[in-house]
């Protein structure tokens, strides 16, 4: 989407021309755009010898090229900004156009129509057209100026949600593009992928003031780029120019103007969360400066933003409270060095490191402090060289640092103890609620080299290479001296647990789980690509490309862990200029996109994890009438005066469940990985139509179909390998596909195959209830959608944008996360843990948002006073109702799409898990309610002279304070229990954010 409006200009000289513009989507990870155009005339002589010059309004730099014999010209790889264009012939200026906007990842298309032979002054009208009749990609552009007009929250996710086909509100806080999970997207800043290399639901956090332009890619990427099966947000930061500029802004969201959060109650009417007592005050301010170091040559931009975010949350009937504070600052800057007009060097550095301290209180008394650190320092270097008029080179180096540190003042001396019993009134009964101590550093070092070569008038070749080295340094453990977490459950005699039948030794049992993960892990991904943009005829353009990817991971000991290569991705796009006037097009796109795993899997399975679970009876465990334990625990006093609880462990139940061992940590783990493992991929097909109704209005439609399959997962396999040494239970491969392993068979190495689609659990293994081999289906996800768009561009008075999306996402695999379990560790999800998980998991997936309406707009009441609005209405997501257990396997630990309806309690003599009767619960048959949100804004601007101004704004988000339920407790039974009903079933667990008011002021001079 373009934000520019071009007024009429008078031009003098020999050839009269009319210019018309169209923003053209291009590659999504570029930090630049381009200008291309054509001179049209009935006489070839009027075209020959014409030269085109563009000048960057901000920096004064310029480039000049001569049109070809058909009147075509192209300026690729231009920095984002505003340009003036002039056409000359025989030394005389024949045409000009001012203030042509170049957006990130887009080409502005210029059309010159020669009107006569006489040299005369004519009037030229420039208009912005959102139609590029050569493009087959799907993208949405919006700049900082337009965003400032709208009531949009100051976050990258809020920008992306403006685009059709995107949906928010997912469990992991990220976005879904085209039905994808939140872990399949990428965010780029000036060409560098700043997505977390390990858990890609997060990315580098940059203040809005630092950004200049955004492009949201929702499908149809060219062969230049891959490694994503969702969507992309491509952003560029501000640059300096020949004029010194200074900006100061402040944004305040006071708690006193917020709507009250909902209180949460259990099904008996008891308050469990005092949302109405929660408080959040947010304040940010920034100062920035830009200008020339050397006029026309070297420029700077610098920004500093301190911030203060204070949050108070009250839970559990006012018994516990948390107070969080973040007062860290952001700094960032950019240097642009124009070595010559044909060679540009850019350097960007910023730090988004954030430290948050959270004090926890129980019954008014201080208990502990949680310390969290995220973000880090980031660096980008870009070089652009215009080697000839037809050959351009772009080189990029960048480094991203993403810290993820979490610790607590009590973590060394306090084990986490969690009460899962039906009578327990509170969850954490120990002296810490910290999930894990964590000291993780994720780094991404990127290098890429891209070429564009205009071979002939009809063929533009793009080719290049890119490489990423992703490093994860991991040190995580459960809190406590022994890194052990204790979970307390009700024990029902006769029930099966860990391969044994429970007795009446105790009313409770304990799961004691010791877990540590440590080591250095690395993944290297590389790719080469080739693409031809072929102008078949004057009205038909074909984009034909191919991409080759590979990735190679290294485990904790420095040895190879997993390698996947020969990921070949064909891409084909067609675009037809229906009337030959550049105002209507039909386009189609087909392509394959691979999803190499992030570092999440290797960091947990690559030789650096020790995970041991034991089950015990709780000795002398007694609860009072209110559900509090009065015995069964040993109390010790910590140095801070806190009481640490350690369960008194009785008899052990079954054998230890162990993965990894300190004695062999760091050893080669590649023997557990399928020799022929294949990467996940998605095939995508798009058919679309766009047309300009008039100079300001455009409409469009797009249909999309996607199919994602071939997941990589850790799989729990119970199989007799015959004369070969067992590789263990946890193996890594493609569920539902043939797995090949190198095993030691009677002293010789042999390649052994297992079709996991037929056998993941042997029929004679105790885990099989049916007595037959149980295999896993192939994981897959399908998505179909139709987008309808109406766009009225800004004309200094008003603008309007509306979209409607019908979409359907279905299958048995969400993608890189599992919203059903809150697991965001791609490749380490539950889908491979038991074949019944995928057998019963078919249906509408978590990101199936069937209907979405989006509207936004702005209206200038006067030149200084503006009002604006943004509205979103979405149908509810599916609810996946589940219970514990299934009719195929004896595993009664996981929640699956069945519920026990007969023989669900303790088993009598002679009975087994096979006697239980289950009812199937199809995925996603229930739905949440629709959600609605209206945001309103108004701003008033004041000029203090020619170069100074101030803007004061008021934005109200969620005006009507609607707080519809976004998620519910969908578990019919309690954890690790086949027959115990879950008393919290159906309760809302997440809601829309309440109304908030943002006050802001911006001063520029």
Summary of predicted features, one role per range:
Residues 556, 562-566, 575-774, 913-915, ...:
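Solvent-exposed loop/turn elements at secondary-structure boundaries
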Residues 696, 710, 808-810, 815, ...:
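C-terminal beta-signal and adjacent terminal beta-strands/loops
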Residues 68, 91-111, 121-239, 270-273, ...:
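Periplasmic N-terminal accessory/gating domains of Gram-negative outer-membrane beta-barrel systems
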Residues 276-355, 371-395, 399, 570:
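Transmembrane beta-barrel wall of Gram-negative outer-membrane proteins
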Residues 318-322, 434, 458, 462-583, ...:
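Signature of Gram-negative outer-membrane beta-barrel scaffolds
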Residues 537, 541, 692, 696, ...:
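Gram-negative outer-membrane beta-barrel transporters
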Residues 26-125:
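Periplasm-facing N-terminal accessory domains of Gram-negative outer-membrane beta-barrel systems
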